[in-house]
Regions:
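Active-site/binding-pocket entry motifs
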Residues: 8, 140, 192-193
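Conserved SAM/AdoMet-binding glycine-rich loop
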Residues: 1-114, 125
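Short capping/connector residues at structural and topological boundaries
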Residues: 12, 62, 78-81, 142, ...
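OB-fold and OB-like beta-barrel modules that bind single-stranded nucleic acids
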Residues: 61-63, 132, 187-189
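Terminal RNA-binding accessory module
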Residues: 145-193
Length: 193
């Protein structure tokens, strides 16, 4: 597993992330290559091609979106828009048809309106993530959000929104996983669940 906060931003001299995937996949004895967590705005066509072409690269991707609202993404300083995220997911799914896609979603971030939240719900319904890590926002000292933005969404509302998206994702995950019923696939057991 290649691990980094923005792992796909890797560059060293003339080597980019796609080259790194190819180099790791070429190592004798390597049968499975995974990586986490890529940054949406740094995903290149070369990286998508490497994922699609290399049988060692698992067709699974954790691609954090955080919110379905452009205004929230801007407040979070994410550096990409929802339309850019949608476009990236479309390109990934076109290149890797059985891609398993997971994400991170935060509700109750500073200034999140009801419409911002509804945009997140609609994005989840559209993207149909296989799974998602979902959180309610809480202040972290030392961050730009803590220094510059008021934590103005009431805690009860954060919890209500979190419960709603968890229920939605559980339903989506159940539906998405139905595609595997009755199929035999190769798996790697990593330990007891």
């Amino acid at each position: 597993t290649l691990l980094g906060q923005t792992v796909n931003s890797y560059h060293f001299e003339q080597t980019d992330f796609a080259d790194l995937l190819r180099a790791v996949a070429a190592v004798d004895g390597i049968e499975r290559v995974r990586f986490t967590s890529p940054f949406p705005k740094d995903f290149t066509e070369r990286a998508i091609a490497a994922m699609a072409e290399l049988p060692e690269v698992c067709p699974a991707l954790h691609l954090p979106v955080q919110s379905g609202s452009d205004s929230q993404l801007e407040s979070m300083r994410r550096g990409y828009s929802i339309s850019e995220y949608r476009d990236l997911v479309a390109r990934l799914r076109a290149a890797i048809p059985d891609l398993s896609l997971s994400s991170d979603i935060i509700v109750g971030f500073c200034g999140e309106s009801e419409e911002d939240f509804r945009q997140t719900v609609r994005l989840m319904e559209e993207m149909r993530f296989d799974s998602a890590f979902m959180f309610k926002y809480s202040e972290r000292s030392g961050t730009a959000a803590h220094r510059k933005l008021p934590d103005d969404v009431p805690e009860e509302l954060k919890l209500k929104r979190l419960q709603e998206i968890i229920a939605l994702q559980e339903q989506i995950s159940f539906e998405v996983n139905q595609r595997w019923v009755g199929k035999s696939v190769r798996v790697l057991v990593q330990g007891n669940s």
